C-alpha cells in the first residue's frame, strides 16, 4: 500500500472539461470510471513499439482477441493500451517527457477512482559491473549526486521530491525470478537517474566533454561502490510522481552495456531486441500471478 497521503490538485474540480493533450482525448470522450476503474497496474517504457509489443503479449496470455486498441487519439504524443486490469503507455526519453506522461496517467486514474496502483517501468539502461543482458531490480532510485530525490524548479523555486520504490514488489519480483527459467541474471541494486545520455552519465563520446577518462572511471567506480548497478534517465520521474499521487512504483531495467568497460552500446540489433524482451518476461509472469490479467 502507498504510505503517503496523495496530493489532489484542487483546481481540477473547477474544470468543465479536462483536456489530455498528449493522449488526444478529454474527460468528455468517455466514462473514465467505466473504462479505467478496474486498473491495478500501469506498465510504461520509452518506446511506443516496445510497449505495444508487451501489451500484445499480455493480451495473448489472457486469451484476448487481437489487435489491442490504442485508446489515445490519432495525433497523440503517447500511446495507451488496456488489457484487463493493466494500462500500457510509452514515456519517451528523459525526465521531461516522462513527467508529462505521469501527470496525464495519474489524472486519468484520479478521474477513474483508482487508488494504490503499481507503476512498473520496463526499460533499457547502462549497467555498472554487470554484463549486458542483466535485469536490474531497483532497490532505490537516486540522482547523480546519489540523493534519493528528483529535483525540479517550479515557479522559479527549487523543489525536491522523494524517489522511493516499492520494496515489497521488488522483493516479490526477485523471489519470482529465482523460480523462473529466465535466460539472464537478475540482480537487486541502486539506480541513478540522470538528465542526459552523455555528460551526466559520464560518457567521453558526446560533442562536449569537460572531464578526463580517469575522472569518469573514478566516478563510476565510486557509485558502483555505493551499490549502484545501473543508470538511466526516467526512473526518478516515475517514482517521485507516484509517491505524491498515492501510487507505487518499481523499475525493472535490462542493461545493454557495462559502463565500467566501455561507453559504447555495441550489441547487435538482434541481441538488443532480445535484451528488450527480458524485463517483460519477468514482469509478465508477475502480472499474471497478481491478477493483472484474467486468463480465459
Curated annotation (Swiss-Prot):
Q: Known Gene3D superfamilies for this protein?
A: Nucleoside phosphorylase domain
Provide any one GO MF term from the record. Answer: catalytic activity
In the record, biological process GO terms are: nucleoside metabolic process; nucleotide catabolic process
Q: One matching Pfam family, short form?
A: PNP_UDP_1
> Can you list the GO cellular component terms from the UniProt entry?
cytosol
Lineage: superkingdom: Eukaryota
Q: Which InterPro entries match?
A: Nucleoside_phosphorylase_d (IPR000845), Nucleoside_phosphorylase_sf (IPR035994), Uridine_phosphorylase_euk (IPR010059)
Entry's PANTHER family?
A: FI09636P-RELATED, URIDINE PHOSPHORYLASE
Family designation: Belongs to the PNP/UDP phosphorylase family.
Q: How does it assemble?
A: Homodimer.
Q: Mind telling me what this protein is named?
A: Inactive uridine phosphorylase B
Q: Which species is this record about?
A: Schistosoma mansoni
Amino acid at each position: 500500500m502507498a504510505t503517503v497521503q496523495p496530493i489532489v490538485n484542487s483546481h481540477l474540480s473547477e474544470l468543465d472539461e479536462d483536456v489530455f493533450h498528449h493522449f488526444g482525448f478529454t474527460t468528455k470522450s468517455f466514462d473514465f470510471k467505466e473504462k479505467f476503474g478496474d486498473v491495478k497496474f500501469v506498465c510504461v517504457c520509452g518506446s511506443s513499439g516496445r510497449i505495444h509489443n508487451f501489451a500484445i503479449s499480455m493480451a495473448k496470455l489472457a486469451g484476448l482477441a487481437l489487435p489491442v486498441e490504442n485508446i489515445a487519439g490519432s495525433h497523440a504524443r503517447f500511446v495507451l493500451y488496456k488489457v484487463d486490469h493493466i494500462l500500457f503507455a510509452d514515456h519517451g526519453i528523459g525526465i521531461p517527457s516522462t513527467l508529462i506522461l505521469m501527470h496525464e496517467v495519474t489524472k486519468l486514474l484520479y478521474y477513474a477512482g483508482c487508488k494504490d496502483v503499481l507503476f512498473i517501468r520496463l526499460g533499457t539502461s547502462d549497467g555498472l559491473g554487470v554484463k549486458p543482458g542483466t535485469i536490474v531490480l531497483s532497490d532505490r532510485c537516486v540522482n547523480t549526486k546519489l540523493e534519493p530525490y528528483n529535483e525540479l524548479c517550479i515557479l522559479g523555486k527549487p523543489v525536491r521530491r522523494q524517489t522511493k520504490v516499492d520494496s515489497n514488489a521488488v522483493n516479490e519480483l526477485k523471489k519470482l525470478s529465482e523460480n523462473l527459467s529466465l535466460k539472464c541474471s537478475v540482480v537487486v541494486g541502486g539506480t541513478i537517474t540522470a538528465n542526459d545520455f552523455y555528460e551526466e552519465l559520464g560518457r567521453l563520446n558526446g560533442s562536449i566533454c569537460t572531464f578526463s577518462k580517469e575522472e569518469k572511471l573514478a566516478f563510476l567506480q565510486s557509485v558502483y561502490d555505493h551499490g549502484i548497478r545501473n543508470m538511466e534517465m526516467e526512473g526518478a520521474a516515475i517514482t517521485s510522481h507516484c509517491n505524491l499521487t498515492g501510487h507505487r512504483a518499481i523499475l525493472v531495467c535490462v542493461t545493454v552495456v557495462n559502463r565500467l568497460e566501455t561507453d559504447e552500446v555495441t550489441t547487435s540489433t538482434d541481441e538488443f531486441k532480445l535484451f528488450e524482451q527480458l524485463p517483460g518476461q519477468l514482469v509478465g509472469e508477475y502480472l499474471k500471478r497478481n491478477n493483472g490479467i484474467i486468463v480465459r
